[in-house]
Design a protein with these regions (language model features):
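Short amphipathic alpha-helical segments
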Residues: 3-8, 67-71, 113, 184-185, ...
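A general structural motif
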Residues: 18-20, 52, 76, 96, ...
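Phosphate-bearing ligand-interacting subdomains
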Residues: 28-88
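Glycine-rich hexapeptide-repeat left-handed beta-helix
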Residues: 121, 133, 138-215
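Hydrophobic, well-ordered beta-alpha structural blocks that scaffold small-molecule cofactor pockets
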Residues: 1-32, 47-49
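Left-handed beta-helix
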Residues: 61-115, 119-129, 141-143, 147, ...
């Protein structure tokens, strides 16, 4: 998908800005190719690349995303921000590096972004939102205004964050969840309203046990 994003960025300009040369992948042999281009090698090949190179790390797991970036030691590597031509960006006074903003995302005003965040299709980031590093927003996440989001959080498809909340670090918010309260760190939440997924499982097993006893 990010290779297609790069192609869209190039097509939107009179002069293409990027020369896409291929992929680096630890899990795919360099003898294999993707439809969009060749696999050039693994992270060891990347770390010994001899010339300047711009890369983007496109991984949907915050933990893995950070691990890969931490293991890239080549000083010739840089991390541009990639923004789809259809994305709407009103005002982002502060932005880091390596962010991926895909089609139909909307960013309004007075937003501060860290680095290496991935914003999938249709994500909405409104006024006065602060976002840290290595967060992954799946399609159609809706963040309300004046929200603080820390680092390494995973937001499921179509989840919603109500205004003025704080989301800590290393949280996993399930698809379709509605977050009505601030979240500390290292939580897995699910549902509307979003609650600890462990509590949901406990309630499920309680109901199942009760039904079995009734029989």
């Amino acid at each position: 998908e990010v290779a297609c994003l790069i192609e869209r960025i190039n097509k939107a300009r009179e002069t293409p800005i990027w020369n896409f040369i291929g992929f680096f992948d630890d899990g795919i042999p360099s003898t294999n190719d993707y439809p969009q281009g060749p696999v050039l090698g693994d992270i060891n090949v990347l770390n010994t690349w001899k010339t300047s190179l711009s890369i983007t790390v496109a991984i949907g797991s915050p933990k893995t995303l950070k691990s890969i970036v931490d293991n890239i030691a080549n000083k010739k590597i840089d991390y541009p921000n990639l923004v789809d031509p259809s994305a709407v960006l009103y005002e982002i006074p502060q932005i880091g590096i390596g962010n991926i903003i895909t089609a139909n995302c909307v960013f309004t005003t007075n937003i501060k972004l860290g680095s290496y965040n991935i914003f999938n299709i249709g994500t909405i980031i409104p006024h006065d939102v602060i976002i840290g590093d290595f967060n992954v927003f799946n399609p159609y996440v809706n963040v309300s205004g004046n929200t603080f989001i820390g680092n390494r959080n995973l937001f499921g498809v179509k989840c919603t964050i109500i205004q003025g909340k704080t989301i800590g670090d290393n949280n996993n918010i399930g698809a379709g969840s509605v977050v009505l309260n601030s979240i500390d760190s290292c939580k897995s939440l699910l549902g509307n309203p979003a609650i600890n997924s462990i509590l949901i499982l406990k309630e499920y097993f309680r109901i199942v046990k009760k039904e079995k006893q009734a029989k």
